[in-house]
């Protein structure tokens, strides 16, 4: 259990970096939905083509998350994060000039690459710099990540409307990404001796627990990617405007941010996080069931329920992965692998939902698919008992592969 002593004042600037980095990892995804009609009309992307704007970044977040431990060992965490944030800024800036579907997909790939590297490396930095406050700082990081999603959904139509140009509604995101790169370069600690994250990753891939965490993270985030891609178009089909449907997505993201920040604090009072994970899954199930059965009854409430469930589950999933190992490099490697496999899984549901929509003329089947995924994750998390962490990661016959190390104090 985490100690409750206060964070040193010297870490305040580093916490600002945590917040600003998290803020930049979702706007480029959530900003597309409210502008989907305009983007589709100019680039020629159909419903399944628009789904690729979510699928491609998610795939890259998965593929390059596996490379995170090796990048950190070879280039260092600080250099990797700064370079990735610069790539995020460039990808958003290039959206000022895209005119075709392929160009739009190219920027999505560039943005997914930048976000993937940050997400793979950054949890290890949190574990290293704040070992006694992993839950609190991970909650802040996750909350800002979700808050960035709200910002993207809200600002994209607001900036695009007066400019009468959807390009501006997406390209403005280059500014906070560049600011985050500059602040990270100045404030993140210098890279020291290379750590053993790459070797740990190879060993962890042999553990069934790693694959279980991947499956849980992927199925839950498949719900997130589906909602981000199709909640606004879903309500556009019900007669909502771009701004109002984007506002609904922003409400969902705000609820995500609040839950991502608050639930880790509440869950930190006990070692077993599963009751809180099951609570978040119940909220997701209620939200998706409501979208399927009564979408117009209380849209704001449905969006808030989904957001709270998705945001809280994301944050707690990250903490559970970091809880498994005391060493920052090894814990970061496990988190990167969980995200790698997870995002590969999460990339597919938006495209599947688009395909089902083309076949049935409705998003109903897509919402029902997410209910099945939630039921699966609820059962899988039953096996993630904190008493099993040690044996699941370091079986008695293989403990020499991952020697126990002690994290530095913050």
Language model feature labels by segment:
Residues 32-33, 208-250, 255-260:
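Extracytoplasmic gate region of multi-pass secondary transporters
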Residues 44, 76, 97-102, 131, ...:
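Helix-breaking motifs and short loop linkers at transmembrane-helix boundaries and internal kinks
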Residues 63-102:
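Conserved MFS/SLC helix-loop-helix module at the cytosolic interface between two early adjacent transmembrane helices
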Residues 64-76, 259-272:
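Helix-to-loop junctions at the C-terminal end of transmembrane segments
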Residues 107-143:
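Cytoplasmic helix-loop-helix junction between adjacent transmembrane helices
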Residues 117-130, 312-326:
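Intracellular juxtamembrane helix-capping segments at the cytosolic ends
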Residues 132-136, 140-189:
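Helix-loop-helix hairpin linking two adjacent transmembrane segments in secondary transporters
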Residues 325-364, 370:
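A late C-terminal transmembrane helix in Major Facilitator Superfamily
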């Amino acid at each position: 259990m985490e100690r409750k002593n206060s964070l040193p004042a010297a870490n305040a600037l580093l916490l600002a970096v945590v917040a600003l980095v998290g803020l930049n990892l979702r706007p480029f995804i959530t900003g597309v939905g409210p502008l989907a009609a305009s983007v589709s009309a100019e680039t020629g992307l159909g419903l399944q083509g628009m789904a690729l704007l979510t699928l491609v970044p998610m795939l890259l977040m998965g593929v390059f998350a596996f490379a995170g431990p090796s990048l950190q060992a070879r280039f260092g965490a600080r250099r990797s994060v700064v370079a990735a944030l610069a790539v995020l800024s460039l990808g958003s800036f290039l959206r000022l000039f895209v005119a075709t579907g392929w160009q739009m997909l190219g920027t999505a790939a560039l943005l997914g690459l930048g976000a993937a590297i940050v997400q793979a490396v950054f949890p290890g930095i949190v574990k290293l710099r704040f070992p006694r406050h992993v839950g609190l700082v991970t909650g802040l990081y996750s909350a800002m990540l979700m808050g960035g999603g709200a910002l993207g959904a809200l600002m994209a139509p607001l900036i695009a409307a007066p400019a009468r140009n959807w390009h501006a509604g997406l390209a403005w995101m280059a500014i906070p990404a560049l600011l985050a790169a500059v602040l990270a370069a100045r404030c993140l600690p210098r890279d020291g001796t290379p750590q053993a994250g790459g070797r740990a990753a190879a060993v962890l891939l042999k553990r069934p627990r790693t694959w279980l965490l991947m499956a849980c993270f992927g199925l839950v985030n498949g719900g997130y990617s589906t909602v981000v891609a199709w909640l606004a178009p879903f309500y556009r089909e019900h007669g909502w405007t771009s701004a109002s449907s984007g506002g609904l997505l922003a409400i969902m993201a705000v609820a995500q941010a609040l839950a991502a920040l608050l639930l880790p604090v509440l869950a930190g009072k006990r070692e077993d996080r599963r009751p809180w994970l099951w609570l978040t899954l119940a909220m997701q199930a209620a939200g998706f069931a409501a979208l399927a059965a009564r979408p117009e009854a209380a849209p704001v409430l449905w969006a808030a329920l989904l957001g709270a469930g998705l945001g809280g589950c994301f944050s707690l999933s990250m903490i559970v992965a970091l809880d498994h190992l005391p060493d920052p490099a090894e814990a970061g490697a496990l988190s990167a692998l969980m995200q790698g496999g997870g995002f590969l899984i999460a990339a597919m549901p938006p495209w599947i939902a688009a395909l089902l929509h083309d076949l049935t003329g409705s998003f109903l089947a897509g919402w029902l698919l997410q209910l099945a995924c939630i039921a699966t994750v609820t059962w899988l998390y039953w096996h993630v008992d904190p008493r099993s962490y040690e044996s699941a990661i370091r079986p008695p016959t293989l403990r020499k592969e991952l020697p126990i190390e002690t994290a530095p104090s913050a």
